[in-house]
């Protein structure tokens, strides 16, 4: 198995999906050991830092990549297995940004109100305990870390170039806590080589990412990348040992939810030979629907189905179990 290590310098970050030359060409089955910068490009370091003063808004959500996967063609399915996610710093940051977040007026939800005050929180990491420290004026809490990647995506179709702040059919900034170690992410390939990137590490995040920023931190990332010929899903699919999941992204929020639901109806049909109405009925009785983000240009919703409620099925020929086995040798 080939193993590629890459720690990008600031001039090597990608800020978009599409429109960026690949940093590496890899073959299916390659393992990647990567470093990702936090969503703020490391610029928020103190509680006195104000986003309007220290952030460059064209340089947020830096991505590591893109990677060109040999043999990947439009219509294929890229399988990205997250083997390991480890905080790369002993601190992380979260903040309120003017006109950004679920509970404030924004450029798209215009309200006659002033922006919320800017405030920055710095979370100190206790590696031994596996916690981050939330500090407020009247409360301090140690919260368990739950590392995840906010952003995983491929180049969009139709020569589109999309900012790394947008989730859509190509993946992107989905911000779902389901994108964690042990997850295999299936993305439809839109361009030769797929051109996938990852980034936006979170040390933990609640469902919905309400204020718009999680516990944002640099991350050491280990992936195994493989390719399935054909079978491209319309929306990103995730597989854990315990669940199947589909992520839909759109506005309004109910359309993001609908996209994830329709995506799961389609997947259940593929896995079990169900017609759409039978799959629709089954989905109605067994699915769970956590929110991923309600703050980005598109919102993201997740539809999850517990494998324990279903007969055994091998999605994409059982590639999740294969990649999980391969990943064990990297840890």
Residue locations for each model-derived region?
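A generic structural signal for residues embedded in beta-strands
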Residues: 34, 77-80, 187
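Short, Lys/Arg- and Gly-enriched loop/turn segments at beta-strand edges
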Residues: 39-50, 85-96, 193-203, 292-295
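Conserved mixed alpha/beta catalytic, RNA-binding, or beta-rich assembly cores of soluble enzyme
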Residues: 145-254, 265
């Amino acid at each position: 198995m080939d193993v590629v290590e890459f720690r990008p310098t600031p001039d090597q970050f990608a800020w978009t999906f599409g429109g960026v030359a690949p940093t590496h060409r890899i073959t299916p089955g390659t393992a990647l050991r990567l470093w990702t910068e936090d969503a703020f490009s490391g610029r928020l370091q103190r509680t006195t830092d104000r986003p309007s003063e220290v952030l460059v808004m064209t340089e947020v959500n830096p991505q590591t990549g893109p990677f060109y996967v040999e043999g990947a063609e439009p219509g294929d399915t890229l399988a990205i297995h997250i083997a390991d996610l480890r905080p790369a710093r002993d601190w992380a940051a979260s903040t309120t940004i003017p006109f950004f977040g679920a509970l404030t007026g924004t450029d798209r939800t215009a309200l006659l109100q002033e922006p919320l005050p800017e405030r920055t929180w710095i979370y100190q990491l206790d590696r031994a305990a596996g916690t981050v420290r939330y500090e407020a004026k009247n409360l301090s809490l140690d919260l368990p870390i739950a590392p995840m990647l906010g952003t995983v995506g491929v180049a969009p179709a139709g020569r589109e170039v999309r900012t790394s702040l947008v989730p859509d059919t190509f993946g992107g900034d989905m911000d779902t806590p389901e994108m964690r170690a042990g997850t295999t992410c299936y993305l439809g390939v839109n361009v030769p080589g797929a051109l996938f990137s990852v980034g936006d590490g979170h040390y933990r995040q609640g469902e919905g990412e309400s204020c718009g920023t999680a516990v944002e931190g640099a991350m050491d990332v280990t992936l195994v990348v493989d390719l399935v010929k054909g079978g491209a899903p319309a929306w990103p699919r995730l597989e854990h040992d315990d669940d199947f999941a589909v992520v839909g992204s759109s506005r309004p929020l109910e359309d993001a939810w609908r996209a994830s639901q329709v995506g799961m109806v389609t997947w259940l049909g593929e896995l079990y030979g169900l017609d759409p109405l039978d799959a629709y009925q089954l989905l109605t009785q067994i699915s769970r629907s956590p929110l991923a983000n309600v703050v980005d240009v598109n919102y993201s919703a997740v539809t999850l189905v517990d494998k324990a409620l279903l007969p055994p099925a091998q999605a994409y020929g059982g590639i999740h179990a294969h990649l999980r086995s391969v990943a064990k040798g990297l840890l």
